[in-house]
């Protein structure tokens, strides 16, 4: 019964695959919970810096930091911070955000603008290289708990270029975490900082600060920290989205494997039944011939 043996081999192979996808689903679920905790833990820090910086900026309207406005002599070039994953098996997560990046690049190209990019994650780096984009720096293999130092080094290339007037905008591209079942690709303007980004929450007091050494130095440092916090938050959200998408993808793969095993077992049983029926028919026919 060669056909039956072949089907049994397929069933065994799919069962082994099912065990792997189930294990990957459980690992992704555990990592997702930790990634969500890191994502939520980063929000209060960014919110507090935003409120303090907003109050300082409103109290000193005569000073405009380079991050808050576009230089009149800025080059017609935009910078992109593209956040993707290092690994695959997470559904269409990377495809969706890279499609959004491509759309923005084409829009800017139609307006006569050039683009430079920093890639965070192997998938984005590979994509940008394939389409011939100018990648000025990158950060990969960040692990499950990224450190700010490893992120800011590459991104600072774009921040410095913007401050020097070599770029007229910087865009942050990542996947925003909505919930376990839904993630949203985002291409948002990082620089110049939009007015709503530097808006104090309702109920926040506008304190009369004393500055040491001076207001300009404090605002300069806080704005840099705020931009760093926005980038870290984007990476944290992208990682939470990655693990959620991977968990869902592996669950779907496990469910599909179970369905396929059921179908293969049905085929095997039918094949086996057909073989038994054939053998019985041959025995009966032989007995009838002898009789």
UniProtKB/Swiss-Prot annotation:
GO CC annotations on file: plasma membrane; proton-transporting ATP synthase complex
Mention one GO biological process in which this protein takes part, according to its record.
proton motive force-driven plasma membrane ATP synthesis
Where it mainly occurs, coarsely classed, is membrane
Sorted alphabetically, the keyword list is:
ATP synthesis, Cell inner membrane, Cell membrane, CF(1), Hydrogen ion transport, Ion transport, Membrane, Transport
Q: How does the record say this protein sits in the membrane?
A: Peripheral membrane protein
What GO molecular functions are on record for this protein? ATP binding; proton-transporting ATP synthase activity, rotational mechanism
- A Pfam entry, by short name: ATP-synt
Question: Where is this gene product found?
Answer: Cell inner membrane
**How is this protein organized at the quaternary level?**
F-type ATPases have 2 components, CF(1) - the catalytic core - and CF(0) - the membrane proton channel. CF(1) has five subunits: alpha(3), beta(3), gamma(1), delta(1), epsilon(1). CF(0) has three main subunits: a, b and c.
Functional description taken from the UniProt entry: Produces ATP from ADP in the presence of a proton gradient across the membrane. The gamma chain is believed to be important in regulating ATPase activity and the flow of protons through the CF(0) complex.
Q: Which PANTHER family match?
A: ATP SYNTHASE GAMMA CHAIN, ATP SYNTHASE SUBUNIT GAMMA, MITOCHONDRIAL
Which family is it part of?
A: Belongs to the ATPase gamma chain family.
* Record's protein name: ATP synthase gamma chain
Q: Which organism is it from?
A: Methylibium petroleiphilum (strain ATCC BAA-1232 / LMG 22953 / PM1)
Lineage per the UniProt record: Bacteria, Pseudomonadati, Pseudomonadota, Betaproteobacteria, Burkholderiales
The UniProt gene name for this protein comes to: atpG
